[in-house]
């Protein structure tokens, strides 16, 4: 009886051992979802942050990227991939909190949070600092090629509507950032929910379309760096990297106003390794790591302690750290209501599709004209050939 009991017990133990470990037990692996080109990766003698973290902690990092807050949000909503750390912007964090999509952080596992400056804590998007830890802050401005675009023109967002530069202008390919530029030009808040003001912004964006080369996001980096475009809205931090490769590039904080933002590290609901995620967040907050990381990506640090490790050229740059007068023209995004967001999305779709019928009509018209010309050319050639044949026959006769 005892033998049968122990045999059954042994069989049960072996069966349990054979079962795959539950996903949450994978304490040696995390998946991070971040903006493109937004972490020091070891190129140009920089610190490979992910590799250094893996070697120090033994935790493997699966690293994926997105190109806008909206695409990141859609990915989280639709599922399919589980993330442990995400790095959205301020207004998107507020949206994720309101929809109960973030895990509260255990700050006992993030002692390096102590290095985050008070000015970056308890922000409106996360007033109790329950769900987020600041990663960087920065501004959106106008990047332009000084060989082709004057400094005077680049002082205003209207540069992106200037027909002198037609075909060489780029625009953000997402509604929130595109509308922000139009709203600044019209003197409206970047957070307006007024339907009339949104429509005016959409109308202004529609007038820009004929002079644009393309609506793009991350591609702005390469197109401006290679000189394929002459002016585009983009992030101050990236400009400092781009200008090293193309010294002809300039940067301005347009006089009408611009967006200032904080990107912060969060843990989404459904994460598989919360402790590993908090270890990663804590690692990025370590002043020497933060400094090495931000020295490379060019964005501004929310840690005074990190500046002690950073290049003087970076921390004294008016692009990365604007003066008070320049900062006074900035405005942070706030979460918009569902209704205002939907209205903006609908208007953006109308902007993107406007003129498509006219373009199609023009293409069809040109094709028809070309067909008619080709018909007459061929007809003339056939008639000429027949005439030559008749002439030969007449001579032979």
Residue ranges and their predicted role:
Residues 18-27, 379-385:
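Sec-dependent signal peptide cleavage junction
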Residues 324-397:
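Conserved C-terminal helix/tail region of periplasmic/extracytoplasmic solute-binding proteins
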Residues 92-95, 231-248:
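A ligand-binding cleft/hinge motif common to bilobed small-molecule-binding domains
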Residues 268-329:
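Mature extracytoplasmic/periplasmic domains
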Residues 33-46, 81-228:
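Extracytoplasmic ligand-binding site segments that recognize negatively charged/polar headgroups
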Residues 198-207, 245-271:
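Periplasmic-binding protein-like
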Residues 8-18:
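Bacterial N-terminal signal peptides
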Residues 25-95, 361:
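Early extracytoplasmic/lumenal segment of secretory-pathway proteins
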